From Swiss-Prot:
Belongs to the proline racemase family. It catalyses: L-proline = D-proline. Inhibited by pyrrole-2-carboxylic acid (PYC). This is Proline racemase. Keywords: Isomerase. It comes from Clostridioides difficile.
Amino acid sequence: MKFSRSIQAIDSHTAGEATRIVVGGIPNIKGNSMPEKKEYLEENLDYLRTAIMLEPRGHNDMFGSVMTQPCCPDADFGIIFMDGGGYLNMCGHGTIGAMTAAIETGVVPAVEPVTHVVMEAPAGIIRGDVTVVDGKAKEVSFLNVPAFLYKEGVEVDLPGVGTVKFDISFGGSFFAIIHASQLGLKIEPQNAGKLTELAMKLRDIINEKIEIQHPTLAHIKTVDLVEIYDEPTHPEATYKNVVIFGQGQVDRSPCGTGTSAKLATLHAKGELKVGEKFVYESILGTLFKGEIVEETKVADFNAVVPKITGSAYITGFNHFVIDEEDPLKHGFILK
């Protein structure tokens, strides 16, 4: 057998949402910072993302990451998040998956009862505490980058729906956060297709008509995700959500960065205090816990430091190959 590429990856899921973590078999990703590494990967090695995320090795809703050498000397490893549509600066469920995999495969030595992990993403340094029992990562709590409400009460005309009102908040990426009632739908699995269609239309309109720019991170200048929320069905949950991203992908988890953005939004509106309990429910009924640890500033924006808690499970170890004679070697999407 002769292959042009042999790639190793760890598969896991966090509250139902997949994370395929590439740990070997790809070229050196150049860059003096994680944003530079992300840019290099996108401009020079994007065929690896499409090969691993899309069919026949993946699927439309696949999510993944590439584990790299960090740029910050204090970090245990670097991470670049990706999906079927491109790359993300930060991902909460992916962070929980990566930290779990790092502990359970020995990338970071396990220390019981709690192992401290420092991960570097394009959005910044992420610090996590992993609860470890008998060498197994049971739960991950991580401090996300500062989150803040960027624009409140934005209104646009959404074709087929009418005028809708929403907030734009940052939780590692920019989110449009909209109540399900604005779209006339409930957050239920059978509505996933329609919710996705409307969310993608909304995201396109926002990025076409509204100027978006992170105040300190020049490379973050678009709304990448749409977070639709509603009243919960789980007795322990505060709210229920579904997050749509990429090329119309549906997050199965409550979305860690989306939870962070929601915490910041509620705090800015006086609806959630520092240290107050918050539980977010996914479209599947799985849960993340969220908490505001402290208040801070991002340039002129009032911001919060969110802590997100959840669990991930390794589901497999993959050894992918790329055959140059395969006409579909770099993946395809059919939807």
